[in-house]
Amino acid sequence: MDNLSYWKMEETDDWHGFKGIAKDEAIISPLKLTVVCPGINLETGKYEETGIPGKVIGEYLTEKRVITCKSDLYSTLFLLTPGERDADLEALLTSFLEFEEYYLRDALLEQVLPRLVKQNPERYQGYTIRQLCQEMH
């Protein structure tokens, strides 16, 4: 991966959303991983009918002891290091798959975010993960 061309962002590419960048002005960091959550149409910039806010994903991962760098409206950023082990990345992927399963079956919030429910029982008792996501969306 010594070839810098793998990481260059070109103005003609539409996947990154940057307009007007000069040639060789911007590169992607191979040590940053941004996961984009559903909720905003990336082409139009408009909200979709449903969404999963990045803060919800970030809180879930924190409860699973997976450290995020930051969570925005509909994305979560991870900073990887050269020392990351396969087991660390596997734990991240497994956590995402578990969250997806909880979301698809609309699990109770006390299963998905038990700490949040414990801190605010009267507010979140009986809530489901989709209810929380939709309310924040």
Where are these regions (language model features)?
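Non-catalytic terminal extensions of PLP-dependent enzymes
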Residues: 1-137
